[in-house]
């Protein structure tokens, strides 16, 4: 993100009369949250910045500098699935192993294996349970019907809006 900050005047110097910039009025950032993959579409922490890109402080500076120039910031927000290393999913797997489906398991598409047809990719868990994972086993799907999940998503979006984000691109929610 520091590289973007360093080159903002080339994108938009904030003065419409100069003609020395590209006149950019929006920047869309692909996933920037912590993730074990190179593409960052399997988020482990929706409230932070992957160290490959900077810190929350760097992000705040980017937003501030962009807004000074009339540039909006759009974040890619991955709400269809998380990382298999996300703390909620790890807790959900533990709960399923204990035969409990009332806690974190409700955040994910965890059902008896018989629930899924043969075309649906899943992570097989214990007790004849599985979690839907259409993209890859490393990306378990959120249960978008769950009130707990929706409340968490409301917190996530509020967190980023409070930091000055102007909007979101919702990734892969059409899979739901």
Tell me what each language-model feature is.
Residues 1-158, 162, 173-176:
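Acidic/aromatic-lined carbohydrate-recognition and catalytic surfaces
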Residues 166:
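Receiver (REC) domain switch/active-site residues of two-component response regulators
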């Amino acid at each position: 993100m520091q590289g973007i900050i360093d080159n903002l005047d080339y994108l938009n110097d904030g003065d419409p009369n100069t003609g020395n910039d590209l006149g950019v009025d929006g920047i869309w950032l692909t996933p920037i949250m912590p993730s074990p993959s190179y593409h960052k579409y399997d988020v482990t922490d929706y409230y932070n910045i992957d160290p490959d890109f900077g810190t929350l402080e760097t992000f705040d500076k980017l937003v501030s500098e962009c807004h000074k120039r009339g540039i909006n910031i759009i974040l890619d927000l991955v709400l269809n699935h998380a990382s298999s290393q996300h703390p909620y999913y790890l807790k959900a797997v533990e709960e399923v192993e204990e035969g409990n489906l009332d806690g974190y398991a409700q955040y994910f598409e965890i059902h008896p294996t018989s629930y899924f047809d043969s075309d649906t990719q899943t992570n097989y868990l214990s007790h004849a349970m599985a979690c839907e994972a259409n993209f890859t086993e490393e990306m378990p799907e959120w249960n978008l019907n769950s009130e707990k999940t929706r409340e968490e998503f409301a917190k996530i979006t509020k967190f980023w809006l409070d930091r000055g984000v102007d909007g979101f691109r919702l990734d892969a929610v059409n899979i739901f």
